[in-house]
Structures are given as structure tokens and as C-alpha cells.
Amino acid sequence: YLYLYEDNHIVIGIISLVPGPDPDYQSIIWKNSGTSPLVLHRLCVDPHRQREGIGSRLMNFAETFGHEQGYTSLQLDTRISNHTAANLYEQLGYTKTGTITRNRGNFICYEKKL
């Protein structure tokens, strides 16, 4: 699923969601394991429009969408160096569940029960 956040017909944010589980997350012990997760793969906000709450609104949309579609949790990851995203996820009630390493670096995994 790919959803756009628009302002006056201009895209200023996107969110990409896919049904889980994600194969990259096999090493993670999820708190809601054995359930049906929705996985966030991308959250992007126009740099000129950051700090306006758009990321939070997109995340709230993802949580509502996931719950309405019958998913039991939302799982995601972010680069260890991406403190802005990590702070957002933690402020929204996401729990750190572990780390993974991919060819692009190290990532922190987060989860929230829906």
C-alpha cells in the first residue's frame, strides 16, 4: 500500500505499508509474535514541511488503517543514526524490539500493538 499526504494537490509526504512478516525481521523477537503484522517500509516528509506533525499524522493513519484491516501490530525499522525518526516512533508509543544489519547498515526495529 502506498499513501500520499497532499497539501493543495502537492505531495508532501508518503507512507508505504506491506503485509508482514518481513523476512529481514526473522532474527527479531517480537512482543506480538505469531500475529498478523503490518510493516512500514517508508515514511517520508518533504524536508521543507518537516516539524509540522505530518509524520505523526501519517503514522496515525497507518495505525488506524492496520487496525481496520485486521492487522494486530505495526512493525518498522529505522537507521540507528536516524534520531529524528527514532524519537518520533518512541513518542508515538513504539517499543524497541532489537536491531538488524543489512547491506545498507544497522537498523533499530520497533513495534506497536494495534
What are these regions (language model features)?
Residues 34-37, 72-86, 90-92, 99-114:
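C-terminal "cap" of GNAT-fold acetyltransferases
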Residues 9, 13, 53-55, 93:
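Conserved phosphate-binding and hydrolysis motifs of nucleotide-dependent enzymes
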Residues 13-18, 86-89, 94:
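A broad helix-preferring feature
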Residues 59, 66-77:
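Conserved GNAT acetyl-CoA-binding A-motif
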Residues 1-3, 66, 85, 92, ...:
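Alpha-helix boundary/capping detector
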Residues 1-48, 59-60, 100, 113-114:
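Acetyl-CoA-dependent GNAT
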Residues 42-45, 51-64, 87-91:
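Conserved acetyl-CoA-binding loop-helix of GNAT-fold acetyltransferases
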